[in-house]
């Protein structure tokens, strides 16, 4: 155990020495560069104005403003190259100064590799230019080419479809629902007819590949929403002509078990009241009188 701890301390000391050496080499490399990074420039600043501002500190070989590849607008930073490192060092005096209404930041541009071959220059953070190296920006890389949150390489990958978070269709649409083509248990959360399409008509709660499979929610028929065997009824819950129930909780008849419906569909008047409710007729009135 003691031996392992000694080896660990030795590795940590070696790592610290390597880090210090690399930092020192990086500083030397920065100070020996004739290219500087200029950040925070105004969007109205062009390369001619940039060259004019830095030419008072030495001969400017190149002044390049980095622009967006799609819109062509300035990304707010640039690189200026001088003929010598001394001139680049003199240009550091513009750090924190105002240029065309904006306070700019000036630093040495560091040369770095890209990881895919090719080399470029970077500012205080990030890299510009993807696989070919390119230039470094203060706020990270360019970020294009790999699709957005809901692009072709979306958050859910191919399972989410070729677009948004939930695929090409709606939450319970025909093609790809919340989980896309390979969902949780079927083709879509809501199946082929929407999340709850035609609750009393064709296509029950989870018809054609719902959450639990390919049957209805209550294992009933598709015309009465799966309640055939649940309330001892042989008729649909919702009649298409009068919107009244033809069968109720007690079997083939209505709530009170009589021959008449509680709410008759033809005249809209109730012939029998609810269970336990006594209707008054002319005989009762005469008896009370």
Swiss-Prot record:
Q: Which GO terms describe its biological process?
A: cytidine to uridine editing; mitochondrial mRNA modification; mRNA processing
Subcellular location(s) per record: Mitochondrion
**What effect does gene inactivation have here?**
Reduced growth rate and delayed flowering.
Residue ranges for the region (Disordered) are 219-289
Q: Which domain of life is it from?
A: Eukaryota
Family annotation (CDD domains): RRM2_NsCP33_like
Q: Which UniProt keywords apply?
A: Mitochondrion, mRNA processing, RNA-binding, Transit peptide
Presequence extent in this chain: 1-31
- Give the matching InterPro entries: Nucleotide-bd_a/b_plait_sf (IPR012677), RBD_domain_sf (IPR035979), RRM2_NsCP33-like (IPR048289), RRM_dom (IPR000504), SLIRP/GR-RBP-like (IPR052462)
CC annotations in GO? cytosol; mitochondrion
Domain RRM spans what residues? 34-111
Gene3D superfamilies from the UniProt entry: 3.30.70.330
GO MF: ATP binding; copper ion binding; mRNA binding; protein homodimerization activity; RNA binding; single-stranded DNA binding
Query: What is this protein's function?
Result: Possibly has a role in RNA transcription or processing during stress. Binds RNAs and DNAs sequence with a preference to single-stranded nucleic acids. Displays strong affinity to poly(U) sequence. Involved in C-to-U editing of mitochondrial RNA. Functions as a major mitochondrial editing factor. Controls 44 percent of the mitochondrial editing sites.
Complex and partners: Homodimer. Interacts with MORF8/RIP1 AND RBG3/ORRM3. Binds to RBG2/ORRM5.
Its family?
A: Belongs to the GR-RBP family.
UniProt protein name: Glycine-rich RNA-binding protein 5, mitochondrial
Give the species this sequence originates from.
Arabidopsis thaliana
Give the gene name: RBG5
